[in-house]
Amino acid sequence: MSLRSKMKTTRRSIAIVGAGDASAAVCDLAYAAGRAVANRGAVLICGGRGGVMAAAARGTRSAGGMSVGILPGYNRDEANPHIEIAIATGMGEARNAIVVASADAVVALEGEGGTLSEIGLAIKLGRPVVGLRAWQQLEMISHADDPVAAVDLAWELARPRMIRSIAGDQGRAANDPGPMSRAPALAGRKKSAT
């Protein structure tokens, strides 16, 4: 399969994370961000339940996009009605790792410990994070005040990761030629006896 044909079948995914019990104002932001994800042609990844997750999925659906809900329980019926693909994990809050690992970038709205864990996991996994009118105290993430600007920034920040993924580099830096180029240097090393 050529690189060009892979590019046609590989879609970026953007996670939108935030409070499961959010204010109407925050849900309005999530809805607009969800629409922006669909308008970019990306797949929405979220926790699949209420609050920010439901508003983002509703926005994505209203713009004709696809949403995937990574659920904490074993029952797919727990998903909000706007989720197109519900994945029941039975993992509880540990499903947050799947949410961010499945995304190329994360847009984070206000939330509590669960949202903060998703931000931390995203940073650990090298996923770009954009705080949407939230998390300004975190200097390790980018920030935006507008939902469309947040998704646009997430889209652009995810681009280098997608290029590496499509090329088959599996997350290596663009200037890293891979393990085979280092093989001669490694061949001379002795293995430690452990």
Model-flagged regions — what are they?
Residues G41, I83-E84, A103, G126:
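Short, well-ordered alpha-helix to beta-strand connector turns
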Residues K6-T10, A36-A38, D77-N80, I98-A101, ...:
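Solvent-exposed alpha-helices and their adjacent loops that cap or buttress functional pockets
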Residues R58-S102:
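Helix-adjacent hinge/juxtasegments
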Residues S2-V68:
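Glycine-rich beta-alpha loop segments
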Residues E93-L157:
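C-terminal binding/interaction regions
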Residues R49-G50, P72-N75, A134-W135:
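Short, ordered loop/turn segments at secondary-structure junctions
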Residues A101-V106, P147-G171, D176, K190-T194:
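A charged, well-structured terminal subsegment
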